[in-house]
From Swiss-Prot:
Keywords: Disulfide bond, Glycoprotein, Immunoglobulin domain. Residues 1-105 are annotated as: CH1. This is Ig mu chain C region. It comes from the Eukaryota. The lineage of its organism: Eukaryota, Metazoa, Chordata, Craniata, Vertebrata. Residues 221-326 are annotated as: CH3. Residues 106-220 are annotated as: CH2. Disulfide bonds join 27-89, 136-200, 248-307, 355-417. The keyword Glycoprotein applies. Residues 327-457 are annotated as: CH4. Pfam families: C1-set. Glycans are attached at residues 45, 113, 212, 276, 283, 444. The keyword Zinc does not apply.
């Protein structure tokens, strides 16, 4: 019995062909009997397409019926006039004639976005001359044909200094397919530091898109990226060591070879400064800290201390000063120690003892747990950050929860919450609790200070 062909359009899976001057379309006829089937093609305006551009393939017998394909290769300018352009596939068969529109998904013309990534100072390496790379990326463009080139001071660079990747399709969302390419230019450290101008050019659809860059663009104060932050001593540091540690934090360093951090007193006298430098961060910058210590009495007197940062990337030294804040409200904390809940003890697993520290100002406070007069490992307790009191935002509270075994608590072991704050008469208070008393007991604070206090000279 006879069977009419079913027609299906064939288009390229790639919305932008390697040779964008040519367009290939096809037509599939399947499930027909008997053979043969004859193909012909017409433009949208019904004029015939020359047989020189048509390639017909032999029928294939499969599943008891035949299928055949026809392909047409045309200059893109012949049909790419608008987004709704198409050509028509015609077939003749003993069962009659059929036709099928074959539409081309027209590749949109999108210009490239050109960006240049400059090398960080510490990226230059190798023997003399030390070299690094400028990286130019053209992205978001379509169609895919693009030509990348570099200029130095307006003149083309040597081709051997340039490496350009293959054009790649970008991850496709709901929009059209776009492309990306990366071009790298090898430069010497001297070329970069001499403030020469480099230009990356992208030639796309007859238009040139470019970006210029030089080290002079990076040389002003706001572009060095170097920032200085002063960290005052914590009460815990002052309480435990009877000295105040001053910290000068420097961020955004491209290199640290020329870095100098120094602390000085109000009268200009230099303080011994210890500098620690971090490992390189993911953005290829470094962080440094400059530490100096002064006596507790000197810090509490309100004396001003100054940190000075010098670096080859800075046009002039950066200076910032730090002193103990004046006219700060001093309110000593109230301390409450709460025994574990009975519901928790019934589980016979662990016991949570809570130390509630309330109504204090300023917010810097020190909380430590002790057992048999010795500090408990901090991994066994957690202390919250100071939080404003809901009914009095000028005052703060924290809570610290110590977790011990149910066995230790039930055996009558005593645990102490030690709280340090500058508004307390002796800077510290201690309250203990155990199963027997079931309520906190105030201890002599001198016992706590005897092992931790030190003398500042």
């Amino acid at each position: 019995s006879s069977s009419a062909p079913l027609l299906f359009p064939l288009v390229s899976c790639d919305s932008s062909l390697p040779d964008e001057t040519q367009v290939t379309l096809g037509c599939l006829a399947r499930d027909f009997l008997p053979r043969p089937v004859t193909f012909s093609w017409k433009f949208k305006n019904s004029s015939s397409i020359s047989s020189q551009n048509i390639y017909n393939f032999p029928e294939v017998f499969t599943g008891g019926k035949y299928m055949a394909t026809s392909q047409v290769l045309l200059p893109s300018t012949a049909i790419l006039q608008s987004t709704d352009d198409y050509i028509t596939c015609h077939t003749k068969h003993t069962t009659g004639e059929k036709e099928k529109k074959v539409e081309l998904q027209v590749t949109p013309e999108l210009p490239p976005n050109v960006s240049i990534f400059v090398p960080p100072r510490n990226s230059f390496s190798g023997n003399h001359p030390r070299t690094s790379q400028l990286i130019c990326q053209a992205s978001g463009f379509s169609p895919r044909t693009i030509v990348m080139s570099w200029l130095q001071r307006g003149e083309p660079v040597q081709p051997s200094l340039v490496s350009t990747s293959a054009v790649e399709a970008e991850p496709k969302g709901s929009g059209p397919t776009t492309f990306r390419v990366i071009s790298r230019l090898t430069i010497t450290e001297n070329e970069w530091l001499s403030q020469r101008e480099f230009t990356c050019q992208a030639l796309h659809k007859g238009l040139t898109f470019q970006k210029n860059v030089s080290s002079v663009c990076m040389g002003d104060d706001t572009s060095t990226g170097i920032s200085v932050f002063l960290l005052p001593p914590t009460f815990a540091n002052i309480f435990l060591t009877q000295s105040a540690q001053l910290t000068c934090l420097v961020t955004g360093l491209a290199t640290y070879d020329s870095l100098d951090i120094s602390w000085s007193r109000q009268n200009g006298e230099a303080l011994q400064t210890h500098v620690n430098i971090s490992e390189s961060h993911p953005n290829s910058t470094f962080t440094a800290k400059g530490h100096a210590s002064v006596c507790r009495e000197e810090w509490e007197s309100g004396e001003k201390f100054t940190c000075t940062v010098q670096h080859s990337d800075l046009p002039s030294p950066l200076k910032q000063s730090l002193s103990r804040p004046k006219d700060v409200a001093n309110d000593p904390p109230s301390v409450f120690v709460l025994p574990p809940a009975q519901e928790q003890l019934k589980l016979r697993e662990s016991a949570s003892i809570t130390c509630l520290v309330k109504d204090f100002s300023p917010p810097d406070v020190f909380v430590q747990w002790q057992h048999h007069g010795q500090p408990v490992d901090p991994k066994h307790y957690v202390t919250s950050n100071p939080t404003p009191e809901p009914q009095n935002p000028g005052l703060y509270f924290v809570h610290s929860i110590l977790t011990v075994s149910e066995k230790d608590w039930s055996s009558g072991e005593s645990f102490s919450c030690v709280v340090g704050h500058e508004a307390l008469p002796l800077s510290v208070t201690e309250k203990a609790v155990d199963k027997t008393s079931g309520k906190p007991t105030l201890y002599n604070v001198s016992l706590v200070l005897s092992d931790t206090a030190s003398t500042c000279y």
